[in-house]
């Protein structure tokens, strides 16, 4: 995982967390 994965996950996990 890296910046690329973090940005993709941020779309779903960002607003959820």
Curated annotation (Swiss-Prot):
Subcellular location: Secreted
Coiled-coil features, chain-numbered ranges: none
Top-level lineage group: Eukaryota
Modified residues (Leucine amide): 17
Keywords attached to this entry: Amidation, Neuropeptide, Secreted
GO biological process: neuropeptide signaling pathway
GO cellular component, one term: extracellular region
GO MF, one annotated term: neuropeptide hormone activity
Tissue/organ expression: Expressed in abdominal perisympathetic organs and abdominal ganglia.
InterPro entries (alphabetical): Pyrokinin_CS
Family of this protein: Belongs to the pyrokinin family.
Function, in words: Myoactive.
UniProt name for this protein: Pyrokinin-5
Lineage summary: Eukaryota, Metazoa, Ecdysozoa, Arthropoda, Hexapoda
